């Protein structure tokens, strides 16, 4: 089974009396960012061999690199050079090409991503401006919480 299919349906845990949370760290990429990446990629429907490029400081990039690898997509991640070596290692492990910009210069990372897209060399999730990012959480998390509420009781 493909890992990206396993995104979501994370456990609900009780944090304190009547306060519950979703344990998003059990997603395949280890974070809640797996949800919007999968949701947006599913709607973009890129074909194997196509390139996806994103400016990111970490977790979205890791999720994207993982899912691109499984779908046969090329992945380019643009990020400031001061991001952790562990993140960079994970990105490369999943086969992503990494373009580093000056430390802390996230605006430049976005510019480079936009240049690659405008040159027709890749598509982007546009994670910061894409309404699907919010829709994903509203649709999927709401449904999971509604189902969990029914199973657990009044949460």
Can you say where each PLM-predicted feature lies in the sequence?
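PLP-dependent amino-acid enzyme catalytic core
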Residues: 1-155
